[in-house]
Amino acid sequence: MSILIVKNMNHGFGDRAIFEDVSFRLLKGEHVGLIGANGEGKSTFMNIITGKLMPDEGDVQWSNKVRVGYMDQHAQLEKGKTIREVLREAFQYLFDMEVEMNGLYERMGEMSEDEMTKALERTATIQDMLDHNGFYMIDAKVEEVAAGLGLRDVGLDKDVTDLSGGQRTKVLLAKLLLETPDIL
């Protein structure tokens, strides 16, 4: 099964062609690396296949429900946030679900019987999703990945703007790993 199909992709800047008639497919389980000298189009290629940039010609098709993780070399970290807060952002969609579920519980006393039935079904669905996605293990996951990249030694409560460039890169990589994308 193809995860990614690129067909007849062309792209350039002005009169400089960067990609000419690029075609390939990435199958599930395959490992591919992208290497090249500075300024040869690696970032442009990644921007095209992740949908941030449209190719001049050709098609880029991802299989349904594939999550792509990409660490932008120019990504910025928000001043005032700790390493721990940035890493927990990898699970923001789960925190949002928890807020929705708690809101439903708070409003249940004012609901009709029909509304209550629907709310209970929705909260059960959310609870299953939280359980299935390891919501109650988030802090342990954050600690584990942070330890693996040496960030616990720096201190997870340290402001990200006080970090060196290499440490910031490790924070971004840790967050990306915690997001568990299908394609990294």
Spans of model-derived segments:
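ABC ATP-binding cassette signature C-motif
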Residues: 1-184
